[in-house]
Curated annotation (Swiss-Prot):
<dbReference type="InterPro" id="IPR002904">
    <property type="entry name" value="Lys-tRNA-ligase"/>
</dbReference>
<keyword id="KW-0547">Nucleotide-binding</keyword>
<comment type="similarity">
    <text>Belongs to the class-I aminoacyl-tRNA synthetase family.</text>
</comment>
<feature type="short sequence motif" description="'KMSKS' region">
    <location>
        <begin position="290"/>
        <end position="294"/>
    </location>
</feature>
<feature type="short sequence motif" description="'HIGH' region">
    <location>
        <begin position="44"/>
        <end position="52"/>
    </location>
</feature>
<dbReference type="InterPro" id="IPR014729">
    <property type="entry name" value="Rossmann-like_a/b/a_fold"/>
</dbReference>
<dbReference type="InterPro" id="IPR001412">
    <property type="entry name" value="aa-tRNA-synth_I_CS"/>
</dbReference>
<dbReference type="GO" id="GO:0005737">
    <property type="term" value="C:cytoplasm"/>
</dbReference>
<dbReference type="GO" id="GO:0006430">
    <property type="term" value="P:lysyl-tRNA aminoacylation"/>
</dbReference>
<feature type="binding site">
    <location>
        <position position="293"/>
    </location>
    <ligand>
        <name>ATP</name>
    </ligand>
</feature>
<keyword id="KW-0648">Protein biosynthesis</keyword>
<dbReference type="GO" id="GO:0004824">
    <property type="term" value="F:lysine-tRNA ligase activity"/>
</dbReference>
<dbReference type="InterPro" id="IPR008925">
    <property type="entry name" value="aa_tRNA-synth_I_cd-bd_sf"/>
</dbReference>
<keyword id="KW-0963">Cytoplasm</keyword>
<dbReference type="GO" id="GO:0005524">
    <property type="term" value="F:ATP binding"/>
</dbReference>
<keyword id="KW-0067">ATP-binding</keyword>
<protein>
    <recommendedName>
        <fullName>Lysine--tRNA ligase</fullName>
        <ecNumber>6.1.1.6</ecNumber>
    </recommendedName>
</protein>
Length: 528
């Protein structure tokens, strides 16, 4: 066993923990199909959102961790439930009144309200694939409609007929009495209307491969369960799919957790082996409600990428997947700065166990680029943008190159992108919310002390010395808690409740420029 493999096995990073579960489930043998199948799912009722990105990003992290532990080939499929009947018209699509005419129709049988694809389902599938391709995910796309119609599930659908009573015995206790009288695992596709029907099944014939039901006119209708003439209810469908495709690893949101036992039992009833499963918590919007594709009540990936790199959003996805997290734009600077810190720690660390525990290893699948920001952070650049009040990144670069002559837009591309992100974020979220504190007599004394300190240092003074001097002024200013001292300074100088280490900020902004800023605040006791 190689040293790297030993270190990977010892790692407590959650992707490696999941990968070891998969390896343990194999009992030392590769599957008969010759590869490990990872599956993610997509409900194409609405556009791909940040949760879609999260599931696929996390899945690939586990897939790549498994590839560190084993030489068994792997494959990732993204399965679209595009044969589901439309239950609700999304609020964020064009021509909702047209779409409303096709309630209960399979998503791939509804005209595309965007006017670009064969159907609504095809449009959403295309958006999904474009979304996944944009971020470099390597996957195979599976359409539920295609799988059913092409006969890929036919063998398992016949087996569902053969095990009909056993499956009903499993499912019925989970329903209320009223639903028990109407439930059936099969949903016929109406030959007349094309709708996905939720009707009681009157008869079923495993040998003939058919089910019978009464239509809305009371007529007996017999249809084959194969060839796309029927679809399974979503709970049996989940378990059937695991058995048919021989899925080895599946991720799903907490909304599936209560039904995971049913999925697994149905898979076993059909002769399959349930996959290793991982349940992640759901993202919440600003009101603490579950984000939804159809409601469009979340930050989109494109929204995030307007203000930060993809690595920062991947870091957010990596952290604590089993914990519910709210999505706010305020999270972006924090995640960018955390990524910068973790990237630097990774390249300073030689111990592979520690490296494997670093999120950036999993974000970059082991090929971690080395970035250099020369001690500058997103938060610091936001503050620099605030005092400069500029939308011109060359203004920021004037301060950056003075602070660190080695840094240039051409040689420090990550830092250059960071300046662009900071300007956008400042313009959209900070500028209109700045609120400056009225300068009191106590504040005037503090500001004069800071001016005196600045007059006795130069741009060559180390930032730690500047920070200590600012701290010492605070110590003698009568604050019981220095937190409020710094908060007052941030509100006076930057119009914000929070801010950077002032030693670093002054070093970046420049001693003379900082003196001018302080003098300006002394002259203008309040700024609207």
């Amino acid at each position: 066993m190689s040293v790297v493999l030993e270190d990977a096995i010892r790692s407590n990073a959650w992707p490696f923990i999941e990968a070891k579960k998969i390896l343990d489930s194999l009992n030392g043998k590769a599957p008969e199909k010759g590869y490990i199948l990872f599956e993610t799912g997509y409900g194409p009722s609405g556009l791909p959102h940040i949760g879609t990105f999260a599931e696929n990003a996390r899945m690939v992290m586990v897939q790549k961790a498994f590839e560190q532990l084993s030489d068994i080939p792997t494959k990732l499929i993204c399965f679209s439930d595009d044969m589901d009947g439309l239950r609700k018209v999304p609020s964020n699509i064009p021509h909702p009144e047209m779409v409303a005419q096709y309630m209960d129709m399979p998503l791939t049988s509804i005209p595309d309200p965007f006017g670009k694809c064969k159907s609504y389902g095809h449009y959403m599938n295309a958006k999904l694939c474009a979304f996944l391709d944009k971020f470099g995910f390597k996957y195979e796309f599976y359409s539920s409609t295609n799988c059913y119609k092409a006969g890929m599930f036919d063998e398992m659908l016949i087996r569902v007929l053969e095990k009909y009573d056993e499956i009903m015995a499993l499912m019925l206790p989970t329903f209320r009495d009223e639903r028990k009288t109407t439930y059936a695992p099969f949903m016929p596709i109406c030959p007349k209307t094309g709708k996905v029907l939720q009707v009681p099944i009157e008869k079923w014939d495993a040998k003939a491969g058919t089910v019978s039901y009464k239509d809305e006119d009371g007529n007996d209708v017999e249809v084959p369960v194969t060839g796309g003439h029927c679809k399974l209810q979503w709970k049996p469908d989940f378990g059937m799919r695991w058995a048919a495709l021989k899925v080895d690893y599946e991720m799903y949101g907490k909304d599936h957790l209560a039904n995971s036992r049913l999925y697994s039992e149905i898979c076993r009833i059909l002769g399959g082996k349930p996959p290793v499963q991982f349940c992640y918590e759901l993202f919440l919007d600003a009101n603490g409600e579950k984000i939804s594709k159809s409601r469009g009540n979340s930050i989109s990936v494109d929204d995030w990428l307007k203000y930060a790199s993809v690595e920062s959003i991947a870091l957010f996805m990596y952290k604590n997947p089993a914990r519910a997290k709210r999505l706010f734009f305020d999270l972006i600077p924090k995640n960018v700065d955390e990524y910068i810190t973790l990237n630097q720690k990774y390249h300073l660390e030689e111990d592979m166990v520690t490296r494997f525990a670093n999120p950036v290893y999993h974000i970059h699948h082991g090929n971690v680029p080395k970035i250099e920001t020369f001690g500058l952070t997103y938060s610091l650049l936001l503050n620099l943008t605030a005092v400069c009040n500029t939308s011109d990144k060359s203004v920021l670069w004037g301060f950056i190159t003075k602070y660190e002559p080695k840094a240039t837009p051409n040689t420090s591309t990550y830092l250059d992108h960071l300046t662009e992100f900071a300007i956008r974020y400042y313009n959209d979220f900070i500028q209109t919310h700045k609120s400056y504190l009225v300068v009191s007599e106590k504040h005037k004394i503090i500001l004069h002390d800071i001016l005196d300190m600045l007059s006795n240092i130069s741009d060559q003074t180390e930032e730690e010395s500047i920070q200590k001097a600012i701290y010492d002024i605070g110590m003698k200013s009568g604050y019981e808690n220095l937190r409020y001292y710094f908060k007052d300074l941030y509100q006076i100088l930057l119009g914000q409740n929070e801010g950077p280490r002032l030693g670093t900020f002054i070093k970046l902004y420049g001693v003379e420029e900082t003196k001018k800023l302080v003098e300006e605040k002394l002259l203008c006791h309040t700024v609207a």
